[in-house]
UniProtKB/Swiss-Prot annotation:
Name of the gene this protein is made from: fabZ
One example GO MF annotation: (3R)-hydroxyacyl-[acyl-carrier-protein] dehydratase activity
Family annotation (Pfam families): FabA
Taxonomy of the source species: Bacteria, Pseudomonadati, Pseudomonadota, Betaproteobacteria, Burkholderiales
E.C. designation(s): 4.2.1.59
Subcellular location: Cytoplasm
Signal sequence range: none
Broad class of where this protein is predominantly found: cytoplasm
Natural source organism: Ralstonia nicotianae (strain ATCC BAA-1114 / GMI1000)
GO BP term, pick one: fatty acid biosynthetic process
Protein name: 3-hydroxyacyl-[acyl-carrier-protein] dehydratase FabZ
Length: 164
């Protein structure tokens, strides 16, 4: 992915955890994005997940050798992509909307992620149409790729809202 010029990159110092909680329905233990560092609306986003030993998945993955599950790296990347989708003023997530995984292609896990690592999450919008969004995503630790994939997500109505 090419780096945009400083003039086109939006440095989002106010895009902290409060803003993330406004845009994503995820909560502990499934909220996997801590802060957005950069966002270029409708193009790309860069965020972070600080990985600590206190993550609940480290209890069993693996005792004595804690490693962040690859599927959770992909989930963190999907949440980052959702922030790019809903971080625009003209496409805010409504209370009755869900952001769902539709597909994952070419997923590769290239580096173990362990407690103390800072996972840098990147998503680039490839295309969007009719509530479907396709992204190239990758996560790095210390500038080394840990995971990469192409993902497709969809915005759909949450039909469970209002059901008892």
């Amino acid at each position: 992915m090419t780096e945009p010029s400083a003039a086109t990159t939006s440095l989002v110092s106010d895009f902290n955890i409060k803003k993330i909680l406004e845009l994503l329905p995820h909560r502990y233990p499934m909220l996997l994005v801590d802060r957005v560092l950069e966002m270029e609306p409708r193009k790309r986003i860069k965020a972070i997940k600080n990985v600590t030993f206190n993550e609940p998945f480290f209890n069993g993955h693996f005792p004595g050798h804690p490693v962040m599950p690859g599927v959770l790296m992909l989930e963190a990347l999907a949440q980052t992509a959702a922030l790019l989708t809903f971080g625009e003023s003209n496409h805010k997530r409504q209370e009755n909307q869900l952001y769902l995984f539709v597909s994952i292609d070419g997923a590769r896990f290239k580096r173990q992620v362990t407690p103390g690592d800072q996972l840098v999450l990147n998503a680039e919008l490839l295309r969007s149409k009719s509530g479907m969004w396709k992204f190239k995503v990758f996560a790095t630790v210390d500038d080394e790729v840990a995971a990469e994939a192409e993902i497709m997500c969809a915005v759909r109505e949450d039909k469970s809202k209002g059901d008892a």
